[in-house]
Amino acid sequence: MTTESDTVTDPVTTPVLHLVMGSDAGMAGGTDTTAIIADVDVYSLDSLNLSRVRGLIVNGNCDQIYLERRREILTDFVANGGRIAVMGHPLTDFLPDLGQWRKLQYSGPKDLAISAGSPHPVWEGVDPVDLSFRREVSGFYGRGYSQKLPDTAIVTNYIGRAGLPVDYVYRLGRGEVLVHGGIDLSVYQYDPNTSSRVFPQLLAWLAQGDGTDLR
């Protein structure tokens, strides 16, 4: 006998899913790029059919204790070739090799300035100055850094005078994990500068060539 709780949902029609807390997309404010991404309640993760999904975005306000209890689902997804982008401040080990987020001690804009690291398609053509200041205010992009990164991690952006990692990518099995230790990157999609490239390029990277080119 199959109960409602045992039922796996039908395959989704978008290559990327955005895990959010219920109807609350947090700072992300949702997205209108419906051809490639759909918002999904994180608490439905157990019943999702991920067989046709290529990428997941974990919203910065998601329940990380719940995610840690579903670590096997997330790990299998990446190990089998999927890609996950983690937004915000990872504080639990819901994926293998996640670095530890730490709050940055800062006193001014230079302590929060973003500088480019290794090249990556998500940040292609993006001026770090446009990430460092949003609406003439510093600190939107991030106010912390990550430590204890896996040996294979590639740091794509640094923060502050000391050049501490704020964004990094690492391989896990046949897939990849991208971690952005700050505000959800979708907030930049309508900004009037090069930072608007980040979110569509993130979606293109997560979709792995399956979906509309949003750049």
Give the label of every model feature segment:
Residues 1-8, 42-43:
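A short, compositionally biased domain-edge/stem linker segment
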Residues 64-137, 198-201:
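A glycine-rich, often tryptophan-bearing local segment used as a flexible ligand/cofactor-contacting loop or short
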